[in-house]
Amino acid sequence: MVCCGPGRMLLGWAGLLVLAALCLLQVPGAQAAACEPVRIPLCKSLPWNMTKMPNHLHHSTQANAILAMEQFEGLLGTHCSPDLLFFLCAMYAPICTIDFQHEPIKPCKSVCERARQGCEPILIKYRHSWPESLACDELPVYDRGVCISPEAIVTADGADFPMDSSTGHCRGASSERCKCKPVRATQKTYFRNNYNYVIRAKVKEVKMKCHDVTAVVEVKEILKASLVNIPRDTVNLYTTSGCLCPPLTVNEEYVIMGYEDEERSRLLLVEGSIAEKWKDRLGKKVKRWDMKLRHLGLGKTDASDSTQNQKSGRNSNPRPARS
C-alpha cells in the first residue's frame, strides 16, 4: 500500500494530512472502536462486562479511566448513594452492546441526580463541589432517549417460575417450601442483633423469582441508618435466597429492621430481620431501645455485631472521603 509506506519526505503539510486520511480509511483498525472487556476494577461488579473507549469523559483508554476514577474511592467508601458506583461506571466504562457500538450509552439523568443528591453534601463538607464533568443536565431522560439505569437492567439468574403468593414458593422449580422462623421485636433481640437500619415503610410490591426475591417499599420514616444511604423514597430490600423472610404483605405498613450489604450499597431483608405491622407504640419503643444501645456504646453487642458483619459481608471501617 503506497500511502502507508515510507513515502517521500518532500510532501507539504497539506499533502501529509490528505495522505493520513486516506490511510485511515483503508486500515480496518481505524474504524470505530469495537466493544472491549471491562478492566476497571471498581466496575467489574456491575451487570455489564463490555465497554467502549473513548468514554463519556473522553478517556481514550481504560488505563486512563482507572487513574481518573481513583479520585472517587473515598467518596464511594462513605456509601453516600447506592447509585454512585453505577453512575460513575456508566460514565467511565459505559456499557457497549452490538446494537449501540457507534456511540456509548449514557446513564439516565435520574441516576445522576440521585447520586448527586446523596453525595454532594459530603463533597461540600470537604470543600469540594459536584464535578462539572459529571453534570446531570445534559444526560437523557429515561422516557425520551436511550439511557441506562439500575432499574432497567434485568439479569438472567435462571428460570422465572410463577410464585404462589399464598405460600411464598415457586411452582415447578422445587418442592422445598420456605419456612420463616419468626423473630419478635423485643429489646433483647434488638440489642443482640444490632440491626444496621430500622425503617417505617409501606410495601409497594414484592418481585418474586425463584432465585431472586426483592421487596419494594416506600420509606415513611427512618428510625436508624448506618453506612448505606436511605432516601425518603421507594427503595428495594434484597434477600439472599428465594424466600422472603420475614414475610411481607403488599399495601401493609411495617417497622422493618435489617442489615446492609455495604459493598453493593443495598439494604437486606434476610433471616433474622424483623418486620412487624406498624404501630406508633412500637416505633417509640424502637427509638428508646436505640438510645439505650447508643448510651451503652454497643456494650455487650460488640461480639454479635462482629458475627453479623461476617455473615453479611459488611465492613465496619468505612474509608473517609478524600479531601
Curated annotation (Swiss-Prot):
Glycans are attached at N49. Residues 304-323 have a biased composition (Polar residues). It comes from Mus musculus. The keyword Membrane does not apply. The FZ domain is involved in binding with Wnt ligands. This is Secreted frizzled-related protein 3. Residues 1-32 form the signal peptide. The keyword Amino-acid biosynthesis does not apply. Expressed in kidney, brain, testis. Weak expression in spleen and heart. Residues 299-323 are annotated as: Disordered. Belongs to the secreted frizzled-related protein (sFRP) family. GO terms for cellular component: extracellular region; extracellular space. It is found in: Secreted. The gene is Frzb. Disulfide bonds join C35-C96, C43-C89, C80-C119, C108-C147, C112-C136. Soluble frizzled-related proteins (sFRPS) function as modulators of Wnt signaling through direct interaction with Wnts. They have a role in regulating cell growth and differentiation in specific cell types. SFRP3/FRZB appears to be involved in limb skeletogenesis. Antagonist of Wnt8 signaling. Regulates chondrocyte maturation and long bone development. Coiled coil: none annotated. Interacts with MYOC. Residues 33-150 form the FZ domain. Keywords: Developmental protein, Differentiation, Disulfide bond, Glycoprotein, Secreted, Signal, Wnt signaling pathway. Residues 178-298 form the NTR domain. InterPro entries: Frizzled/SFRP, Frizzled_dom, Frizzled_dom_sf, Netrin_domain, Netrin_module_non-TIMP, NTR_Sfrp3, SFRP3_CRD, TIMP-like_OB-fold. One of its GO terms (molecular function) is Wnt-protein binding. GO terms for biological process: cochlea morphogenesis; convergent extension involved in organogenesis; epithelial cell development; hepatocyte differentiation; inner ear morphogenesis; negative regulation of canonical Wnt signaling pathway; negative regulation of cartilage development; negative regulation of cell development.
